[in-house]
Amino acid sequence: MKEQKWIHEGLITESLPNGMFRVRLDNEDLILGYVSGRIRRSFIRILPGDRVKIEVSRYDSTRGRIIYRLRNKDSND
């Protein structure tokens, strides 16, 4: 059976080496996020200040996988 995961939204607060980021979730938790392979393959750039969707395991809630970068409402893209 596939492992159950929680999906949260959060804000990238800090960029760390090797594709790792410090993410502040909407519930004010601070966790360590790493970039998923699909985002890495698509060359999607993630910077501090971006809003992301992050998938968190029920067994280790201090780490998560960034699965989607949300569009900023104030950008001109």
From Swiss-Prot:
UniProt domain S1-like: residue ranges: 1-71
Mind naming one GO cellular-component term on file for this protein? cytosol
Pfam families on file: eIF-1a
Q: Which domain of life is it from?
A: Eukaryota
**GO MF annotations for this entry?**
ribosome binding; rRNA binding; translation initiation factor activity
Keywords noted in UniProt: Chloroplast, Initiation factor, Plastid, Protein biosynthesis, RNA-binding, rRNA-binding
User: Where primarily located?
Assistant: plastid
Subcellular locations according to the entry: Plastid, Chloroplast
Please give the family membership noted in the entry: Belongs to the IF-1 family.
Q: How does it assemble?
A: Component of the 30S ribosomal translation pre-initiation complex which assembles on the 30S ribosome in the order IF-2 and IF-3, IF-1 and N-formylmethionyl-tRNA(fMet); mRNA recruitment can occur at any time during PIC assembly.
Its function, per the record, reads: One of the essential components for the initiation of protein synthesis. Stabilizes the binding of IF-2 and IF-3 on the 30S subunit to which N-formylmethionyl-tRNA(fMet) subsequently binds. Helps modulate mRNA selection, yielding the 30S pre-initiation complex (PIC). Upon addition of the 50S ribosomal subunit IF-1, IF-2 and IF-3 are released leaving the mature 70S translation initiation complex.
Q: What is this protein called?
A: Translation initiation factor IF-1, chloroplastic
Q: Which organism is it from?
A: Nandina domestica (Heavenly bamboo)
